[in-house]
């Protein structure tokens, strides 16, 4: 998308013009980018975090924990911490980490690399880490350790009764579209829904489970789209 008209009724994209009566911006990692294209001014800025997972293998299936295990969360941060996860095939994982990343789609190094985005996000992250806003410096240091096998092995001793026979970095990667509140200088831990004329912006929808939630869809429709 190149731009939105000043009256918020027309989208210009790749030399094509699209007229609309209502648009819902729920673009996840790109939601703030689209909001900026519509000239929406907010106190929020995007700080993406990458989540990586470690695949855990045990010598016997009976040694695999039969329930999800979560750490006690840090209430100063909107993250659940590294916890256990299963996939549909029964594989067992530990994760995700929450590492600051300098690109909305930086799932792999230097793929879909955007230099301007890299510079902008690097600048924002570096300043916040230097001044330790919302303990981001401490978070970055602690999460950086989770990129190394030795640290994950140490953590696994707390989670499991039996020692894993193999721990390997999984190809599963996710990027969290986290919003930072410039006024409170904290990572925001709730949805941000803003109605701008006939555009509804849904920011900080950090999880696919949230964006696919019927309850969330019902809330948006009832409060922002249905005329009473």
Question: For each predicted feature, which ranges?
Answer:
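A sequence-composition feature that detects small, non-aromatic residues
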Residues: 6, 27, 31, 35, ...
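Flavin-dependent oxidoreductases
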Residues: 3-114
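Short alpha-helical "patches" and their helix-cap loops
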Residues: 1-4, 226-228
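C-terminal catalytic lobe of FAD-dependent flavoproteins
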Residues: 125-228
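FAD cofactor-binding and catalytic pocket of flavoenzymes
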Residues: 64-127, 144-167, 177-190
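Short, intrinsically disordered/low-complexity patches at protein termini
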Residues: 42-44, 117-118, 224-226
